[in-house]
Regions:
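Outer membrane beta-barrel translocator domains of Type V secretion systems
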Residues: 1-105, 228-241, 245
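Short glycine-rich beta-strand segments
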Residues: 19-25, 65-75, 116-128, 174-180
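Extended alpha-helical regions
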Residues: 86-156
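Membrane-active amphipathic alpha-helices enriched in small hydrophobic residues
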Residues: 3-5, 48, 117-121, 216
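Outer-membrane beta-barrel strand-turn architecture
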Residues: 5-12, 50-56, 105-109, 113, ...
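Solvent-exposed, glycine/polar-rich loop segments of beta-barrel outer-membrane systems
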Residues: 30-37, 72-91, 125-146, 179-208
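A general structural signal for short secondary-structure boundary/capping elements
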Residues: 65-69, 109-110, 164-165
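Outer membrane beta-barrel transmembrane domains
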Residues: 42-43, 140-250
Length: 250
């Protein structure tokens, strides 16, 4: 869920604003024990949108935000024929910058085709993870990561106005590739509450190397307030996403 405060100028497509939101993610891992994790993350940030022509067909948008997250993990693992578990809690925090440039081609009165390209940068860190309950508890060292994620895609958008009300619907597909430290973060773990040696953890919870994502967005506004809803799918990890947002324009 998100709140967006936007100040528009007399020039079409030129605006500046800030936003705040809360995101909840529920992860289900494809391991033998079907481990799970719940993530709750809060964000606050600013954005600026700049048009390069009079009708805003070519537009550049940049945004930056800071975030903090609270995570609960239920790790389940199989030993012979029995499933054991261990639970932990940890925190995340960081900051990110997003750049996107888009070009809109009008197909008819209501439909438009919008190809776009972007570059997303993010630095984050997670706290030490020490499982408090369960069998074979693990301890993971605190670590940081740096994400460099270029993206290219296109949207098919529809807009219909009736009075002061606007209805917007878009379907999009995009390709993104992770080039940063996320896919090779060198995380270290050991058996908790012992003097055992540290070892390297293999793999990542979220893999965005060569991901194709699709999105459906539906929005309504009356030029003062608005609401949006979206649902999406990622081929990497077979993730399903969804969210609701609120918007206020001054």
């Amino acid at each position: 869920m998100a709140y967006v405060h936007e100040d528009e100028t007399v020039r079409l497509g030129e605006s500046v604003g800030w936003y705040a939101g809360i995101v909840e993610n529920k992860l289900k891992f494809k391991d033998l024990g079907n481990s799970k994790e719940d993530q709750l993350q809060g964000k606050v940030g600013m954005f600026k949108s700049v048009p390069f022509d009079e009708n805003n067909s070519l537009n550049w948008t940049i945004s930056g935000d800071v975030f903090v997250g609270y995570n609960k993990m239920n790790r389940r693992f199989l030993v012979v024929d029995d499933i054991f578990g261990a639970k932990s809690r940890y925190y995340t925090y960081g900051l990110g910058v997003k750049n996107e440039i888009s070009k809109s081609f009008r197909l008819s009165e209501g439909f438009s085709f919008v190809p776009h390209a972007g570059l997303n940068l993010e630095y984050g860190r997670f706290s030490k993870i020490r499982e408090k309950s369960g069998e074979m508890r693990l301890e993971v060292k605190a670590n940081d990561y740096f994400s460099i994620r270029p993206e290219v895609g296109a949207d098919l958008a529809y807009k219909h106005s009736f009075g002061n009300n606007n209805l917007k619907v878009s379907v999009g597909v995009a390709y993104e590739n992770e080039l940063g430290k996320v896919a090779n973060a060198n995380n270290k773990a050991r058996v908790a509450y012992t003097t055992a040696d540290w070892y390297d953890l293999r793999g990542e919870k979220e893999d965005r190397r060569g991901n194709i994502k699709t999105d459906l967005n539906i929005g309504w506004d009356n030029q003062r307030v608005g609401v949006t809803a979206n649902v999406g799918y990622d081929t990497k990890g077979e993730n399903v996403r969804g969210g609701v947002g609120f918007r206020v324009i001054f």
